[in-house]
């Protein structure tokens, strides 16, 4: 009896899961959109970008300081 109830609950859960994922037009495609984009274009990954340490020379246009703000071409 308990096994039958567990099977019924599992079937209902899987059916509901199927309907919930079918409602969205993309299904499960958009779960990890950024990671997929970074796999196609490794240049876009934030892990590949280098940053300038504190009190180092920086580029104020790209703001490439690690944990500081670029002020007059120095990370402060």
From Swiss-Prot:
Propeptide stretches in the record = 23-50
Q: Which UniProt keywords apply?
A: Calcium channel impairing toxin, Cleavage on pair of basic residues, Disulfide bond, Ion channel impairing toxin, Knottin, Neurotoxin, Presynaptic neurotoxin, Secreted, Signal, Toxin, Voltage-gated calcium channel impairing toxin
Q: Which cysteines are disulphide-bonded?
A: 51-66, 58-70, 65-75
Where does it reside?
Answer: Secreted
Residues of the signal peptide: 1-22
Spell out the molecular function terms from Gene Ontology. Answer: calcium channel regulator activity; ion channel inhibitor activity; toxin activity
Pfam families noted in UniProt: Conotoxin
Does the keyword section mention Glycoprotein? no
Q: In which tissues is it expressed?
A: Expressed by the venom duct.
Pull one GO CC term from this UniProt entry. Answer: host cell presynaptic membrane
Q: What is its main location?
A: secreted
Q: What does this protein do?
A: Omega-conotoxins act at presynaptic membranes, they bind and block voltage-gated calcium channels (Cav).
Q: Any notes on this protein's domains?
A: The presence of a 'disulfide through disulfide knot' structurally defines this protein as a knottin.
Give the UniProt family note.
Answer: Belongs to the conotoxin O1 superfamily.
Write the protein's name: Omega-conotoxin-like TxO5
Q: To which species is this protein native? A: Conus textile (Cloth-of-gold cone)
């Amino acid at each position: 009896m308990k096994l039958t109830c567990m099977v019924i609950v599992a079937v209902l859960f899987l059916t509901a899961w199927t309907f919930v994922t079918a409602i969205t037009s993309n299904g499960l495609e958009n779960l990890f959109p950024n990671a997929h984009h970074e796999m196609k274009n490794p240049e876009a990954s934030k892990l590949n970008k280098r940053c300038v340490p504190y009190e180092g020379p920086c580029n104020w246009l790209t703001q490439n300081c690690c944990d500081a703000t670029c002020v007059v071409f120095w990370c402060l």
